[in-house]
Every structure is written in structure tokens, then in C-alpha cells.
Amino acid sequence: MAAGGGGGGVSRAALARPPIHRGTSAPGGAIAAAGGDGDGDEASRLLGRAQPREAPYLIPRPDGDLAVPDDLQYATLDLTGDPVAVGAGSYGSVLVYGSVAVKTLRAGFGHEAVMTLLAAEEARSAGVRGVVRLMGLSAPLRQLMFPAYEMDMDAYRRSLTARPGHVVHALGRVFTELGRALVFLNGRGLSHLDVKGGNIFVRTCGNMVVTAVIGDFSLMALNSRSALADPRFRLARRKALKITSLARSPPTGVLLGHARDRPTRVLMDFINGRPPPPGPLPYEVGLAIDLCALGHVLLDVALGLRPQRGQALTREYAVEVLARRCVLFAALLPPGSGPSAEALAGDILEEELAAGFREGVASSRPGNQPPRTVAPLLELVARFCGEDGGARFAELAA
């Protein structure tokens, strides 16, 4: 299972676990389960609710603050059954109890809780699919609770041995839905900034994806379309959370990520030493980052590629990324989808870096041609990663 809030996936063999039998206690009664697209139905039943949550996650107050409903909060956790560990790292850990995933944070609880509440409320109020639903939170325990999923998209990619027509059709459907969800969130002032296979959670039927949602809002930031001033998010027992500086001004490292899945213009600004503009993250930049990253996840799934991460982020590495992208996109995507190598070489200000780029283009090889069956997925990749910053897809998704 994969946790809706991040933490990676486990093999199908780990799914043979007893279901949980009871929920947890909360200041305002039993915890309320949230769902959408069926992602919380089973968890809702196990936690004592017949239907997924329809009530707001945030309630506006006259003083401008936002109150978190009592029935979404809990002070103690009492889920029976053997938990399955599906992720651990510097952020904390994720345990799955049957149909429920519990993410316990060592640090950053306030930021992630606020961003998760905002994303969940926007998606709930608009009926948007493709965004994981929050089931509960606990400030004392530094926990967030989500529906558990079968695996993440990276695990699904590894499980595929072939990509027949029905698999391609299902992937096109769920990735289009994920793209629309990201367009929606960015339009509401929320840029995810950490879209990757490990943060997309899926349920399958055989080798076909049935449901996919984006989760893990630990790096989410407000963009220039956000109308939020400086509200407090009021919890039970007079506790409150606030929007952090990370949400208002994401650092350069977050914007650049692992470089490989970032928009060409973001990488070019880094290569040429241009700092991010002052003020909030521009909406167009946040949207382009999210859609370009989603496109690279789809590219990896369509071609069975293993994403390369962990390289030191230098200008030389960014040049290498762009050189490989020019060659790969020219070979795989529809004409005009990728960046022009000649134009990019002229845009690089330092001659030494420009020369390195030209050498990288000359030495890169696109690899084997993909099967024709995945052509519809590559067309969708082109829309996500196009040089227009994803604007074409955003127009279609509006």
C-alpha cells in the first residue's frame, strides 16, 4: 500500500493484512473520513461514517481566521491490526493500518498540515478529482491521516511488463485527470512543486490503473493567484497554525528540484544566474513546474524509464539535462514540442557553458524507438512539457 500523504509504496504481497476495526477519538467525537472518487469509501466505513466527508475542512471566522472542524482532529490514535511501514526518512514515517495511512512528522507539521487543509478544501468544494483527501490530523501527535492506496506510481511503473492498449488508455485518462487537478490547484493559488511518481498514489485492476491521486503537500507554496492574507488556522484547545515562509517564498532549491523534470525556462534562468523574481511565486511558473514534472512522470511510465535523482545541482548539470532533453524530445514527441537546441545554445550567456551544451547535444542518443501503442501518452507528455509552459493543456482543462 502507499500512503496518500507520501512515503513510497510496497509490493502487492504486503496487502494481505487484517483490516482495522475501529477509528480514533477526537475532541469533537469520532474522526470524520474524507473521500473522493471512492478513495475514502472503505476507510469511511471503517471509521464509522457511511459516506465520505462532505463538510468543509476549513470554516471561515469573522476575524479572518480559519477554523479546523473538531471532527477532523484527534488527540489519541487507536487503530487495531498490524501496521505496515511504507516509508521513513528525515520527514518522519508512514504506517498503514488496513485502509488508513498515518503520516507522523518529525518536523514541518505546521506547513504540511496547512497546505494539506487548503488543497483538500479547494478540491472538496469544487468536486475536483485527482487530489488525495485528508481524513484527520493531530497536532499533539504531529500526524496526518489519509486513505491508503495500493501503491505509488513509481511502484506501478516497475510492475509493468507490457503496455497494451487498455493500459495506455487508462494511463491517458488518469494523467489527464491529474493534470486538470494541478491546473485547478494552481488556479486557486496552490503550486505543488514536488510532483513525482512517489507522490502519486494509485489503485489498479490487474495491470490497469483505475484511480490516481496526487498527495504529499510538504513543499506546496502559494502562488501569485492566492488571495490569502495572513490567517491563522485554529485547532482545538486554542492552538493555531500559520502560513509559513516556505509557503510564501519557496527557496531556489525547491523550484529547481532534481532539474530533470523542470521547465526549460526555469533551468535557463538558473544557468544564466538569474534569481527568482521578488514577491510571490508567479502563477505561470508554478503551473509550468507542476505540469512539466507530471509530464516526466508519464514519460517514465510510458517508456519504462527509471528517473535519475540525487545528482548535485550545478549549472553544468542543468546544461547536461537540457542537452539530453533536446535530443530525447526531438526523437519521441510530436514536432515542435521540445526546445530548439540551436535557440537554447544562443540563450546561454557563458560561452563555456554554451559549448558544453552543444557537445552534450552532439553526444546524446535518444535510445530505442518506443512502440506505437504509447503514442497517445507521448502526445500528452508534449502538452504537459511543451515550451508554452503547459498553457495549452491548461486551456483544454479549463
Curated annotation (Swiss-Prot):
Any one Gene Ontology cellular component term annotated for this protein: viral tegument
Catalysed reaction equations from the record: L-seryl-[protein] + ATP = O-phospho-L-seryl-[protein] + ADP + H(+); L-threonyl-[protein] + ATP = O-phospho-L-threonyl-[protein] + ADP + H(+)
Gene3D superfamilies in UniProt: Transferase(Phosphotransferase) domain 1
SUPFAM superfamilies assigned: Protein kinase-like (PK-like)
GO biological process, one term: symbiont-mediated suppression of host innate immune response
Region Disordered, annotated ranges: 1-44
GO molecular function annotation: ATP binding; protein serine kinase activity; protein serine/threonine kinase activity
Positions contributing to ATP binding: V86, G87, A88, G89, S90, Y91, G92, S93, V94, K103
Catalytic center residues: D194
Record PTM: Autophosphorylated.
Domain Protein kinase residue range list: 80-398
Signal peptide: none
Annotated Gly residues bias: 1-10
EC number annotated for this UniProt entry: 2.7.11.1
Keyword entries, A-Z: ATP-binding, Host cytoplasm, Host endoplasmic reticulum, Host nucleus, Host-virus interaction, Inhibition of host innate immune response by virus, Inhibition of host RLR pathway by virus, Kinase, Manganese, Nucleotide-binding, Phosphoprotein, Serine/threonine-protein kinase, Transferase, Viral immunoevasion, Virion, Virion tegument
ATP-binding in keyword set: yes
Localization, UniProt: Virion tegument; Host nucleus; Host cytoplasm; Host endoplasmic reticulum
Recorded coiled-coil stretches: none
Job description of the protein: Multifunctional serine/threonine kinase that plays a role in several processes including egress of virus particles from the nucleus, modulation of the actin cytoskeleton and regulation of viral and cellular gene expression. Regulates the nuclear localization of viral envelopment factors UL34 and UL31, by phosphorylating the US3 kinase, indicating a role in nuclear egress. Disrupts host nuclear lamins, including LMNA and LMNB1. Phosphorylates the viral Fc receptor composed of glycoproteins E (gE) and I (gI).
Note: Displays a substrate specificity similar to host CDC2.
Family, per entry: Belongs to the protein kinase superfamily. Ser/Thr protein kinase family.
Protein's recorded name: Serine/threonine-protein kinase UL13
Organism: Suid herpesvirus 1 (strain NIA-3)
Gene this chain is encoded by: UL13
